[in-house]
Amino acid sequence: MSKPIAYVLSTRELSAVLVEKAAAKGVVIDSLAFIAIEPMKVVDLPGASAVVVFTSVNAVEAANGSGWKIFCTSGATRRKVVKRFGEAAIAGTADSAAELAATIVGEGWVKAVWFFCGDLRRDELPARLKQAGIQVHEVVVYRTRLTPQMIGREYDGIAFFSPTAVESFFSANRIPAHTRLFAIGRTTAEAIRRHCDNPVTTSGRPDAELLINQIIHDNTEE
């Protein structure tokens, strides 16, 4: 491990590989989860040939089926879809839920989708699809519970991975104006800006590794 040059808080657990990668560059990452995921039992699942939509890894992990045509967000969600259902199952991807909705509408042939999601899902995707006349069957497969807690020190940077985690964090904490903030995507960045004026760096894609790489870069290239 290099001599520490920055201390960063991740608001969700990260893999040991990413934490060690950052530490090797002198960026010390503490992980503290601000939300908890509780899987739900699902009885009504779509049959083969259904068009299925995923915008989170948690939703993919809770789904079981075959023969689906799958639209999903990129990054970790896409990788999980490939692992569980195979590359051939993917009908389209995009970097955000809003962009994914536009992709689905743009296909022109989709009449109905099964949207696997959590109980606190955002409205961009289903609203856009319904507006375009596409029927949306929502399948709630997990609950998201906020777990706010006060942090015990100041950090040089804080990484956020969902708008819900942002709400949980700021319900219990205030941060100095100099703290750098990092967001996994645009909706998460927008949630941060509702709570503070600190500068926010947004990952190019919804991918934890890309975000950690950005954090390392921002703390070592000055």
Q: What are these model-derived regions, one by one?
A:
Residues 1-222:
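Signature of uroporphyrinogen-III synthase
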